Regions:
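Structured, soluble regulatory/oligomerization domains located on the cytosolic or IMS-facing side
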Residues: 1-100
Length: 100
């Protein structure tokens, strides 16, 4: 039996979406738990407040679900690091007004 995985991850607005999509496609193709005969898609899922949310959808054997999930998440992080694709973290700008 097979199971589809949908993994969401974020990139910064100043990162190139095409480069991120290409990197994730290549990472998925190299992952031994991802079924190569099934379609792998990477799409923009949301334009959030401080990031672009991407989703990768791929298939794995049911018994390899967790290995596929964990290895893909780790490989995406390392792949983004190597490609210079930034994963943003929440931040807040505080503006102080002087009292008059």
């Amino acid at each position: 039996a097979e199971r589809r995985l949908d993994l969401k991850f974020v990139i910064s607005y100043d990162s190139d979406i095409r480069s991120a999509r290409k990197a994730v496609q290549e990472i998925a193709k190299k992952n031994p738990y991802v079924l190569p005969e099934r379609e792998i898609t990477v799409n923009v899922d949301e334009l959030a407040d401080s990031s672009v949310v991407l989703v990768v959808k791929f298939w794995a054997k049911k018994e390899n679900y967790w290995q596929a999930r964990y290895t893909m998440l780790e490989d995406i992080k390392y792949g983004f690091d190597e490609a210079g694709i930034r994963i943003p973290y929440p931040q807040m700008d505080v503006h102080l007004e002087s009292g008059t």
